[in-house]
A protein has these predicted regions:
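Conserved SAM-binding motif I beta-strand of class I
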Residues: 6-11
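Class I S-adenosyl-L-methionine
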Residues: 47, 105-156
Length: 156
């Protein structure tokens, strides 16, 4: 993020936030420019200052469940799709959003299909969408979507 950057991290599990904090500490990294928030990703706009709406450089989603924790606690399309809409509105022109999808776990395939449908329906004038998937792996292997928000003068 550099000296001027700021990171907001969201999760509904305190354990995930604690693990993140521990990783920063182990790496000798300061948490001065990091805010870890115990809340759902679909409420991100409520936690990000209005002055930063439309100015965020990057948003990253790592969907699914927390490895080594309760695998019944998963992300679902019900909160993920509104979170993606919110994230797109927060991005600055030419900002990037990445989404790692895990169709291999129970419920992951449903969420992945919904996210792909959402991304496929984005107007080209608003964003470009890239799918990065390993073709020589099983169909339920994790994969990445990357979305670049259009420059304001590229629209229309």
């Amino acid at each position: 993020t550099g000296r001027q950057g700021f990171v907001y991290g969201f999760d509904i599990q305190q354990e995930a936030l604690d693990r993140t904090r521990e990783r920063f500490v182990r790496a000798g990294r300061s948490l001065d420019n990091v805010l870890l928030i115990l809340d759902s990703h679909d409420r991100m706009t409520e936690h990000i200052a209005p002055k930063d709406h439309g100015a965020i450089a990057a948003v990253m989603f790592n969907l699914g469940y927390l490895p080594g924790a309760d695998t019944s606690i998963i992300t679902t399309a019900a909160s993920t799709i509104p979170a993606l809409d919110a994230a797109l509105s927060l991005l600055r022109p030419r900002g990037i959003m990445t989404i790692v999808l895990y169709p291999g776990h129970e419920g992951g395939d449903v969420e992945a299909s919904a996210v792909e449908a959402w991304a496929s329906a984005l107007p080209q004038a608003d964003a470009q969408v890239l799918c990065y998937r390993l073709l020589n792996k099983h169909a339920r292997a994790p994969y990445l979507l990357a979305i670049e928000k259009a420059q304001a003068n590229e629209k229309g």
